[in-house]
Amino acid sequence: GNTGTLMVDRFLQTTDFILGIGTSFAISNFTAPMPPGVIKAQVTNVPEDLNRDNRVQYGAIGDARLVLQQLLEESKSQLGEHGRGDVHGVRDEIAEIKKEFMEEWGPRLNSNEIPMSPYRIFKEMMNAVDPRDCIVTHDSGYPRNQIVPFWPALKPRSYIGWGKSTQLGYGLGLALGAKIAAPEKIVINVMGDAAFGMAGMDIETASRSELGTITVVLNNGVMTHYYDHFPHATEHWKSNELGGNYTDTAKSLGAYGERVTSPDEIGSAMARAVEASKTGQPALLEMISKEEETISTYGR
């Protein structure tokens, strides 16, 4: 997406080496710019991606898993089975920068505003479930920009990120696939009301197939920031405005549905959605939120 964390930004500014795993190093609005003059190594299974947009000093063509295994084997042969440990205190440095980052965003993450702040919604979601037991994905647009810097990916395959494409509604399909692949997991997709308008009917697919996904819709009544893209249409025809009761829509399609208007309701609503999902019934939580344009643009 278009966002980044303070942690990534600080290390990009001070690093002397970057290892890209499974990346094209493409220059895009959706990727962090690489600092100039820094030695780079690239692992990719697409030969054409080597030196495509960014010059790399070391390249490895191969599957990321296999190359990483080879790197680990070579590291152990040089440094021993347990390596040399965190001799430079990098973990503590990351923790300190993260503390600074979270303090900066604390007012939004702890906001009691009504309509609700998306950041407070995400915080309450994280408190309501164990991210280790979940598979979470976002949608494109502002929901992605807002959740990416803050949702913790604590285990492999617990978070599905897709940052270089912008099709609205794609996250719902990803959630259905994830639930089929890992039915024991709590699968959550976060989408805006515009994204629901593009793909929301697939809630019926989840109901019919007994796929207990949880869809969190951030309903702020608009396509955020689109007045800048279509000022005339926005002024004369309100082309950026959206309306509807997505809770009732979900119920009519066989899902459990609940509308949430206050931050203190989120935890209990999430618990009820999880219980419904365990029976194979998809759940939709319609979060009445504010239009939030502030995003974390560190490293951009």
Question: What name fits each language-model region?
Answer:
Residues E96-A178:
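Active-site diphosphate/adenylate-binding microenvironment
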Residues G20, Q42, V136-H138, N189, ...:
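Structural beta-sheet core signal
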Residues D16, G22, L68-L79, K98-W105, ...:
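Structural signal for hydrophobic packing residues in well-ordered secondary-structure cores
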Residues D9-T15, N51-D53, G59-I61, R65-Q69, ...:
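Thiamine diphosphate
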Residues G1-E93, F230, A273:
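Glycine-rich, acidic loop regions that bind phosphate or pyrophosphate groups
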Residues F25-A26, Y142-P143, V222:
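Alpha-helix capping/helix-boundary segments
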Residues V90-M102, L284-I295:
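A short, charged, Gly/Pro-tolerant segment at domain boundaries
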